[in-house]
Structures are given as C-alpha cells and as structure tokens.
Amino acid sequence: MIQAARQIASGLSAYPKAIRLIRKNRLGKFLVLPVVFNIIVVVALVFAGYGLGDWIGDIIERHTENMNGWIQAAMVAIKIVLPVIFFIVFIFIGGTVVNVLMSPIYTILSEKAETILTGKEFPFSARQTAKDIWRALRIALRNTAKQLLLTFLCLFLNFIPVVGSIASVCLIFVINAYYFGSGFMDYTFERWRYSVTESSKGTSQLKYLAIANGAVYSLPLYLFCGTFFAAFIGGVSAVAATISQIELKARP
C-alpha cells in the first residue's frame, strides 16, 4: 500500500516538474509539431465527414426521382450528423492516434529530459535512433490493440443497469490510463536498454506510477476537451514519466 501511494504521488507530482523543466530549458519547440498535427487531423476529419455526407446525399438524389419530404430531411440529417460522428470518434481515439504518430518526437523529448536531469549524454546514432523509434511505434501499436480490446470488453458491463455502467466507465478509465502511462514510461526504458519483455516487467512493478501518469493524460479526453490538447499533454506526460522513473530508481 505504501509502495502504491509512493508511485501515485510520484506520478502526479512529476507533472508540474515536467512543465517547469520544459519551460526552463526551452523544450516547448518539440511540442509545436504535434500540436499543429493534432489541429490538422481534427480539421481533416470534420471535412471528411462533410465530404462523405455530400457523397451519400448525391447517391440518394441520383437514385430517387421524386424525393419526398422525408428523404430530403434524411439527406440534410446525414450532412449534419456525419461530421459530428467523425468528430466524436476522434474525441475517443484521438489520444491513441496522437501517441502512435508522435512517438518519435516524444522519444527525443524524453531523452533530452533525462540528459538535463542526470547529465548523462546519449551520443547520436542514426541507426540507434531509428531502432528506438521503431520500437516505440511497435509498443504503441501493441498497447493500443490491448487497450481497445479491453475497452471493448468493458462495454458489455453496460448491460447491467446503473452499477454496470459506472463500473464500465471506471474500468475503461483505469485501463486507458495504464496503457497510456506504460507507453510514456517505455521511452525511458528503451534508453536503459530494456528489452520489450523487461519493459513490460518494469511497468508491472511500477503499475501505479503508470496509472497516475496516464490518468493525467486521459482525464481531459474524458472531458471532451483533451483531444485538442492531446499532443501537448502527451509531450509533458513523456517528460513527467521520465522524471518519476529516475526519482524512483534513485530511491533505496
């Protein structure tokens, strides 16, 4: 219990430290590209929804000679609803998509944070950097698959009135927090030359840290505003995870 409390406290307290570190050392430039990319994806999905709505509407119009009021109303509804659906889908999967695509940048950001904190330099190697980025992408995709599967299974709890719905929301939040957090922690584990298996074991030993770190990232997503800030929060989360791991490693 003490270990769990220590890990949770470390995970949460690392965020203000991460923000100060990023600001003091001018690392904010590494968050610009993810934020711009995030905005582009949101806009693209909304326009894709409008485009698909127009396309479906044209098909209906071509195959319907005499459109009555109901069909016209349906066409208008499709054009309005599809962009909303696309946007809602991004709200729920946006954090995951951003994590997968931005993992190369988060890898670099985490490395710079460790260098600042410990003074340890990591000589640049194009080959090693490519290997680290590839590993980060593989782990992000693996975690995403597990995350989505467990989230889908939790949805069945909604068939149990009230209690099941509450349990489903809570479990999905914890699952997402754990896998987001473990992904951010792996950026440090890969620099410590942990194998994928060793990284999984390390995350299991620090599971409460993973949940605390990922919870800060996940909570805004549940509040429907986090999708716009997922890229920024993700960068801070990667640095926060590095800070926590170094702190806990230094403790006896």
Report the location of each language-model feature.
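Selective recognition of hydrophobic, aromatic-rich stretches within alpha-helical transmembrane segments
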Residues: 79-114, 158-191, 223-252
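Anchoring transmembrane alpha helix of integral membrane proteins
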Residues: 1-25, 29-34, 39-44
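Interfacial aromatic "cap" segments that immediately flank transmembrane helices
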Residues: 18-36, 122-153, 180-220
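Membrane-interface segments at transmembrane-helix boundaries
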Residues: 5-16, 58-69, 96-136, 183-204, ...
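Small-residue-enriched transmembrane helix starts and helix-helix packing motifs
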Residues: 1, 10, 211-216, 241
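Hydrophobic alpha-helical transmembrane segments in multi-pass membrane proteins
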Residues: 35-49, 86-91, 142-171, 213-234
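Long, highly hydrophobic alpha-helical transmembrane signal-anchor segments
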Residues: 47-92, 130-156
